[in-house]
Each structure stands twice: as structure tokens, then as C-alpha cells.
Amino acid sequence: MTNLRKTHPLMKIVNSSFIDLPAPSNISSWWNFGSLLGVCLIIQILTGLFLAMHYTSDTMTAFSSVTHICRDVNYGWLIRYLHANGASMFFICLFLHVGRGLYYGSYMYLETWNIGVLLLFAVMATAFMGYVLPWGQMSFWGATVITNLLSAIPYIGSDLVEWIWGGFSVDKATLTRFFAFHFILPFIIAALAGVHLLFLHETGSNNPSGLSSDADKIPFHPYYTIKDILGVLLLILILTSLVLFSPDLLGDPDNYTPANPLNTPPHIKPEWYFLFAYAILRSIPNKLGGVLALVLSILILAMVPFLHTSKQRSMMFRPFSQCLFWILVADLLTLTWIGGQPVEHPFIIIGQLASILYFLLILVIMPITSLFENNLLKW
């Protein structure tokens, strides 16, 4: 009798994706983040579902309902902080996953990469809308500032902003629709992740060397299932440590003050995972220019495959490109730091220089260096 997992219409899909999937024998722990992102998404959907059972999306009661969840609901504080810090873990895994893709040339799988960029945008949109829901000071003013950026779009800008707000300011209509979108988007993300995997399994995984691994494949189970479980355990260890010991470490104290349209906080800033993009936005004195730079800072990832000039796929054997990659990482960390600082000297000029370097590295310096490396090897 044939094995059921290989013949059953549903089981054979699972089998070909997670059990008998041929995988390269040399993929390192940098390949764990895909499964970790899946786990993060499941954690976020489950905790979010239980939060939605107690949350009310009304400006008068939203803040109180979050307080009620933390004080009166059984383990409500745990669910709330798992959800808030789960978002931070999600973004840490996302950034490492994208960084891995850039380093090892995984972006050469165009469809997989472009759906990944789309996923990044979707997760960022979801996180932004989720941050508005507790209706604290930073929620309200963050929503006001970021949605207001759309008014920089010529001709239709101001109409577009009022359409998104559902009125003339961020109010009840805005909060209600943000809650609706925040609820639906994770399911769209899950569907997109399925398509992401579908395209990945068409080509098979890349590996650290960037060479074809067709000659040396091993089954996904048990090798990489065990490896993924180790990653998941480490993720859960870090997440629970964060939630149980310092749940507010990555949050903003201003969000414990209920939203007040008449009182602007001294420093409006988004969550830590948006600070790099926020720094790029602020470094350009022109509103429309800032918005374009903000969008391009993420959209530039879609251009990376077309800027690949090296004859080698991975950076494993390219020391100069490696050096530039780590400069890019340092630059992004600098931007993240600047995004959280007030707009004053010397932070303004540091932010502007870091923003210029970010775009220069990706668009100019790295492609030219790759050509230089080809030349060194007489390719």
C-alpha cells in the first residue's frame, strides 16, 4: 500500500512542502528565519484574535478596553504583551531574513523576492495600524503625522487624506477602519506567504555558496524540521524573556497617556522598527521629497536584482562586497538611532549623511564594486 502522505490530496501538498522537500545540504542558520516568520505570524494571529474579543474600536473606550485587558482579563496582560513584543520579534526576523537574501543573492529568484517585498510592505502597514489601536498619545499623533504625509501627493493629496481619515481629523471613523484593516491584513499576509513558498519551491532554496545544489540534496524532514524547532525554541525563549521581564522595553511611555488632540507630545516617533525609514523621511527638508525617499527606502529592494553586476551570486567569496554589506548594516543602525533623536544639531546632518550613504551604497557603490571584483578574477 502506498504511503498516505504521498497520495492523499491534502497530505501530499504538506509532504512535498515540509517532509520530502529536497533541500540543499549546506544551508546555515540564516535559513531558519522563514520558518520563524511563520511562527511569528501564527503567534500574532492567535494573540490578536483573543485581544479582538475584548477590544473596542471606539475613541471613547479604546484606551480603557486595553487597560481592561491588562487588568481584568485572565492573562490579558500576557496576551497583550506577547502581541506587542511579538511584532518586534517579527520585524527582527524580517530584517535578518531580508539581510540574508541580500548577502547570499537570494534575490535572483525574482518572483519569490518580489512577493517578499510585497509582504514587507503589508507587514509594515499592519504594524502601523496596530500601533494606532491602543489610542494613546503616540498612537494618535503617529497616525496623524504618517497619514498626513499623503497630503504631499500633488492635486489629490488633501482629498486622499480626508478620505482615509473619514473626516477632517484622525477620529472614530479612522480608528474603526484601522481596526478592520489590522484584523484582515494578517490573513492576506498568510496567503501571500503561501504564494511566496509556492514560488520558492519551484526553484528550490539558495545556499551560502550561491552555487547550484542540485547534485547534493537532503530531505527537509528530519534534518531541517529539527533545525527549525531549535530556532523556534530560541525565538520563544527571547520573546517570553522580553514579555515577562521587560515588556515595555521597546514601547513608548507616551502611549500610556490617553490620546489628546489638544496636546502634542514633544517628540513624535514611531516604533523602533520604523525609525530607519522615519530618519530618511526627516532628512529631506521637502515634504514630497521626504515621502518619496521614505517609499523608495523599502521599494529599492525590488531594484536590487537588476543592480546585481557580479558573476557570482553570493557574497561568500567576495570580501569587498562583504565589507560594503556590513557598512550598509551599520548605516541602517545609525539611521535607526537618528530616527529616535530630536531634530537638532548634530542629529540632522548625521541623518542626512546616513540617508545619502544608504542610497549610494545600494544604487552605485555596491554594483561598481561587484564589477571591480569580476575584473580582479579576470571574468
Swiss-Prot record:
Report the locations given in the UniProt record: Mitochondrion inner membrane
Subunit structure as annotated in this protein's UniProt entry: The cytochrome bc1 complex contains 11 subunits: 3 respiratory subunits (MT-CYB, CYC1 and UQCRFS1), 2 core proteins (UQCRC1 and UQCRC2) and 6 low-molecular weight proteins (UQCRH/QCR6, UQCRB/QCR7, UQCRQ/QCR8, UQCR10/QCR9, UQCR11/QCR10 and a cleavage product of UQCRFS1). This cytochrome bc1 complex then forms a dimer.
Pfam families (UniProt xref): Cytochrom_B_C (PF00032), Cytochrome_B (PF00033)
Q: Which InterPro entries match?
A: Cyt_b/b6_C, Cyt_b/b6_C_sf, Cyt_b/b6_N, Cytb/b6-like_sf, Cytochrome_b, Cytochrome_b_C_euk/bac, Cytochrome_b_N_euk/bac, Di-haem_cyt_TM
| Cofactor binding annotation | Binds 2 heme b groups non-covalently.
Similarity comment: Belongs to the cytochrome b family.
Free-text function comment from the UniProt entry: Component of the ubiquinol-cytochrome c reductase complex (complex III or cytochrome b-c1 complex) that is part of the mitochondrial respiratory chain. The b-c1 complex mediates electron transfer from ubiquinol to cytochrome c. Contributes to the generation of a proton gradient across the mitochondrial membrane that is then used for ATP synthesis.
Q: Which controlled-vocabulary keywords does the entry list?
A: Electron transport, Heme, Iron, Membrane, Metal-binding, Mitochondrion, Mitochondrion inner membrane, Respiratory chain, Transmembrane, Transmembrane helix, Transport, Ubiquinone
Extra remark beyond the main annotation? Heme 1 (or BL or b562) is low-potential and absorbs at about 562 nm, and heme 2 (or BH or b566) is high-potential and absorbs at about 566 nm.
Residues the record lists as binding heme b b566: 97, 196
Q: How does it sit in the membrane?
A: Multi-pass membrane protein
Binding-site list for heme b b562: 83, 182
Species for this entry: Sorex samniticus (Apennine shrew)
Q: Which GO terms describe its biological process?
A: mitochondrial electron transport, ubiquinol to cytochrome c
GO MF annotation, one: ubiquinol-cytochrome-c reductase activity
* Residues holding a ubiquinone: 201
What is the recorded name of this protein? Cytochrome b
Q: Cite a GO CC annotation.
A: respiratory chain complex III
Please list the cofactors this protein needs. heme b
Q: Which residue ranges does UniProt annotate as crossing the membrane?
A: 33-53, 77-98, 113-133, 178-198, 226-246, 288-308, 320-340, 347-367
